[in-house]
Amino acid sequence: MAVSAPLRSLEEEVTCSICLDYLRDPVTIDCGHVFCRSCTSDIRPISGNRPVCPLCKKPFKKENIRPVWQLASLVENIERLKVDNGKQPGELAREPQDMKLCERHQEKLHYYCEDDGKLLCVMCRESREHRPHTAVLVEKAALPHREKILNHLNTLRRDRDKIQGFQAKGEADILAALTKLQEQRQYIVAEFKQGHQFLKKREQHLLDQLATLEQLLTEGREKFKTRGVSELDRLTLVISELEGKARQPAAELMQLSDRLSCLSLRYPRKKFWIGKAIPHMVKRKAGEFSDKLLSLQRGLRQFQGKLLRDLEYKTVSVTLDPQSASGYLQLSEDWKCITYTGQYQSDCLLPQQFDCEPGVLGSKGFTWGKVYWEVELEREGWSEDEEEGEEEEEGEEEEEDEEPGYGDRYEDWETDEEDESLGEEEEEEEEEEEEVQESCMVGVAKDSVKRKGNLSLRPEDGVWALRLSPSGIWANTSPEAQLFPVLRPRRVGIALDYEGGTVTFTNAESQELIYTFTTTFTRRLVPFLWLKWPEARLLLRP
């Protein structure tokens, strides 16, 4: 049966350090240590005539040995308790199984030799080998190490508490972040659902207007066809009647001379209907509907361009590489602006420099990610203000007249003789303009793009760019594709998706989507500018 910890502690207090058994007839010596009386008689003097205490090495006189009756009584009580616990009297409490014993004497190791750094039992301590050495109790020798361990243990416990605190805070932060993400997910779903509903409603509204126009034109077509057939039949009868009169003999014809003299009065041309296939008001409503479609196209392009820039791309600040700049170009001190000089100004030609083409590359390249920057074109007259003014004036003129609604019937929209007559068509003249040499290009290029000689600067050459000129805007494809944005961009946004293989151009001010190149990139890409336009500047933003 296991012995309780308090009992084991009492047993250690009444154990003789020499015989390692219960104190039998316990006595105390001058230094205060207690041993069995029989054990003290075995203590031999180390030097001189006086024996010394085995524990503290202090000499004592045998005549000063005194019995300790209280300890003797305590030993008896302990033995009685052990009997009550099922142990034989005199049997010591078992030591833990991992308690180390002296390999030589199979005794407990109570001492530590500071000279040899070894654990000693009582017999080893009294041996000739260790008697001259300084030996202290194991507990005393272990005290500094124990303190060191406890200090380090306290440090580790503090670290553990800190880590637990950090972990708890981190878990709370992660939970808060996950909660926020969930809220954002719900917000995104709700916003897009609302947006879908709004667009669906607007779509249905436009489709309803379109259906109304289709119905009006279909009804008008049937009415126009029916009335036209009726008038043709009536006119055919008149023609047949006149043809019959024209075939009459001269005598009979002369008898009708009085009637024929007023032929124009009897058969006036104005009596016959000449109508328009599409009434003026229907044409006007159809034109208004086309304007709405243009507004829809512009709004959707602006929406797409803004989402593309704000949600997916990282805005970067780029500068130009002066060593790649053509001698026809002049760079600003911050390497963000170029102007066209018209004269080659470079004294020496560098290997990485454009010679014939007035181009320049960016100093920063990209091999991954989604990045965005802007290029601003500064030149007098290059703006969309005039076009906006014209559109506003046309809109004001259209709003001045009161017009029928979409719910009116076809016949309500018919007009009088002031409307255009049937068969009248508007003539459109197309003028072929000579190719304008003044232009600029903005986009991206491979860092290995050719720079010597006359270059086409197309995608197959490693350049993906827009060309802007007074005559229009083109995508530098093969062949060139002319583009028709709603507004001429003063600032062009360039969005590069390297992994996605796209270069997208937008109007940075109106957010209108202009054009997208699609390919697979395998080399480092850099910004690309090309300018052959006097009194114009290209500036990198931001």
UniProtKB/Swiss-Prot annotation:
EC number: 2.3.2.27
Subcellular location: Cytoplasm; Nucleus
Alphabetized InterPro entries for the sequence: B30.2/SPRY, B30.2/SPRY_sf, Butyrophylin_SPRY, ConA-like_dom_sf, PRY, SPRY_dom, TRIM/RBCC, Znf_B-box
Catalytic activity: S-ubiquitinyl-[E2 ubiquitin-conjugating enzyme]-L-cysteine + [acceptor protein]-L-lysine = [E2 ubiquitin-conjugating enzyme]-L-cysteine + N(6)-ubiquitinyl-[acceptor protein]-L-lysine
Region (Disordered): 379-440
Gene Ontology terms for molecular function: ubiquitin protein ligase activity; zinc ion binding
GO terms (BP aspect): host-mediated suppression of symbiont invasion; innate immune response; positive regulation of non-canonical NF-kappaB signal transduction; proteasome-mediated ubiquitin-dependent protein catabolic process; protein K11-linked ubiquitination; suppression of viral release by host
UniProt feature coiled coil, ranges: 197-243, 411-440
Keywords for the protein's UniProt record, in alphabetical order: Coiled coil, Cytoplasm, Immunity, Innate immunity, Metal-binding, Nucleus, Transferase, Ubl conjugation, Zinc, Zinc-finger
A GO CC annotation given for this chain: nucleus
Domain of life: Eukaryota
The keyword Nucleus appears for this protein: yes
SS bond list: none
Composition bias, Acidic residues: 383-405, 413-437
SUPFAM superfamilies linked: B-box zinc-binding domain (SSF57845), Concanavalin A-like lectins/glucanases (SSF49899), RING/U-box (SSF57850)
Known partners and oligomeric status: Interacts with TBK1; this interaction bridges together TBK1 and NEMO in order to activate TBK1. Interacts with INCA1.
PANTHER family reported for this sequence: E3 UBIQUITIN-PROTEIN LIGASE TRIM
Protein task: E3 ubiquitin-protein ligase which regulates the IFN-beta production and antiviral response downstream of various DNA-encoded pattern-recognition receptors (PRRs). Also plays a central role in determining the response to different forms of oxidative stress by controlling levels of DNA glycosylases NEIL1, NEIL3 and NTH1 that are involved in repair of damaged DNA. Promotes nuclear IRF3 ubiquitination and proteasomal degradation. Bridges together TBK1 and NEMO during the innate response to viral infection leading to the activation of TBK1.
The protein's name in its UniProt record: Tripartite motif-containing protein 26
Species of provenance: Rattus norvegicus
Taxonomy of the source species: Eukaryota, Metazoa, Chordata, Craniata, Vertebrata
Gene name, Swiss-Prot/TrEMBL: Trim26
